[in-house]
């Protein structure tokens, strides 16, 4: 866990609760003064539910169809009525030069929602996040979330 201040803790007892929170967050993001413009990081071990939460959030924001995990591509872009969204998965990110070569600096400088899994692998390159989710597994279905 990083040194950010925890302002809220949540318990997602099942995937339905995860989806419900994603819908609440989506509504809040769309209605903020700056529009759909934020950097959200998601920390947690493998299988903690980061991608599942992002899928629910993307669907709540209007993405239709299948939401792919960007583990191998590193980033998947989406366009919704509210604006641009980029879903990053830095799990396999090892080469800082890739940051420049792939145009990530330009993406993070542009307006839109950036959702970043495994931010620890891009430390020093990512901007300070607007929201950080620390997701941990309590049991098979239940997740403990600190923001």
What are these regions (language model features)?
Residues 1-8, 59, 94-147:
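Short phosphate-coordinating micro-motif centered on Lys-Gly-acidic
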Residues 2-27:
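N-terminal pre-Walker A segment at the start of P-loop NTPase domains
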Residues 28-37:
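Phosphate-binding P-loop
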Residues 39-41:
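Short hydrophobic/aromatic beta-strand immediately N-terminal to the Walker A/P-loop
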Residues 43-45:
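P-loop (Walker A) phosphate-binding loop of NTP-binding proteins
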Residues 50:
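Conserved lysine of the Walker
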Residues 63-78:
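Short beta-strand-centered segment that lines the nucleotide-binding/catalytic pocket of NTP-utilizing
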